[in-house]
Amino acid sequence: MKPTFKPAYHLLLLLCCYLLAIPSYGATKYVSTTGNNSNSGNSWALAWRTLQYAADQVNAGDSVWIADGNYAGFDLRTTGTATNPIVFIAFGNSAVINAPNPVTTDGINIEDANYIEVNGVRVINQPRNGIRLVFADNCIVRNTFCDNNFERGIFTGFTDDILLEYNECLNSIDEHGIYVSNSSDRSIIRYNICHHNNRGGIQINADGSQGGDGISTDPEIYGNVIYENGVAGGGAINLDGVQGAFIYNNLLYENHATGIALFQQDGNEPSINADIVHNTIINASNARWCILAVNGSSGAQVFNNILINQHAWRGSIALDPDAVAGFDSDYNIVVNSLSNEGDGQAMTLTEWQALGYDANSMIADPLNQIFLNPGSDYHLLNDAQAVDEGSAAFAFGINEDIEGTSRPQGSQHDIGAYEAEGSLVVDEEEETPDIYTSGITINAESISWARGLTGTLMLMNVEGKVIARRDISSADEYTLHDLVPGVYLATVHTPRGLQWSKGFIFSGKR
């Protein structure tokens, strides 16, 4: 079974529409296919009919719950604030936006509006982008499913401090799964799955031609699963004019262009000083390099990665001569093909080590001696060469793997995105929402869970704000006493996505 993130349309229906007022927040509104825009929007019985009408009415602090059904999208130009964001959140398991909004050719367009959250909708078959945000800082897009949109699943431009998490973006017809552009700084792109997109899986392009400084600084890209992208070119993680990127705990496999590409094309400066740590990259046989740094993209630090290329001669790492300055790499598993002269040349690991790189790195064993099930399950075998062969000193503070397992489990960090857990064999088929349904109990004043589960329990209020997180790897409970009485959504996420969710009412401490 491929590691997949279950998108937000798997949310279980909240069982009630009860709401107690929370003074620090704005109004809660409702949209339903059986609603009417002449209604107040204050309950499901009085729901509005269209998302655009809701977008025209909301103010800072308001939340809009969206019932199951098919909708045209919305264009939002009203801003929220840090303490009072505007949230559009799917209430059921299938709130689908399958027609563009009335202003642009995107499903959702958020423009000149900050502190907006979009949560849990499915956006499909759009003429341009599934979800578009421009001139929109401090926004969140989470738990969405963006399929078969012409340009990209999620597109952003001039969006500082954006958070994109737990989204699935697939089958973009022309370009990328996720595309962050135009001088956007401090992006966090985590726990997404991007697959079968025509070009890149995740692209950040600073694009100085559109204004701004043409540099995107300090993004964090981690916990993502990216596969089967790039038939028309475009790296699985493609960075143009991006500086100070921190790229870790990602699984990239069977992509058809570069794994991680650092370059300058539209950006005003090269993609310098990237830290690339604890990733697993398995390139397809028709791919380019696992890691490529060109156009002066110097200073890359490459440690504790599995970098396996199935191409006939392209290999693990290639640097242009002008990207060599400040580069360092070690404790990687590589193929016997590397280059400091760009794409057209290759040398052996021994020759590469003579240049001062990868002194403690090793040539990869066959895939079936490293991974549980190459092609579908890239957990490490317990006796894989990657186990205990990494270095904590070069882990850049990363003390968990892609699934939240603590590093190290043995005497030293394992190489790659996954940390082996001794004799534990992870059965992808067994970890299903049914296990979580039977293993998690919502009581009057607490949420408890049994042994044998994995993941992170998160509680969200009606505004879509995450108000609590707890690891559930051992039996325990979370008391609700600190919550304000009201309606809440409990979810469990693993790096494979949303596994379980349930709405509940907390009536207060007894």
Q: Where do the protein language model's features map onto the residues?
A:
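C-terminal accessory segments
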Residues: 346, 351-419
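C-terminal tail/sorting-segment detector
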Residues: 442-444, 466, 485-510
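Glycine-rich beta-solenoid repeat tracts in large extracellular/virion proteins
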Residues: 73-80, 106-112, 129-135, 152-158, ...
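Residue-level detector of functionally pivotal "anchor" positions at catalytic/ligand-binding pockets or at interdomain
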Residues: 358-360, 419-446, 451, 506-510
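Acidic Gly/Asp/Thr-rich repetitive segments characteristic of extracellular carbohydrate-active
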Residues: 33-67, 72-73, 352, 384, ...
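Beta-solenoid repeat scaffold
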Residues: 59-98, 111-119, 138, 352, ...
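Right-handed parallel beta-helix
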Residues: 85, 89-94, 114-125, 137-151, ...
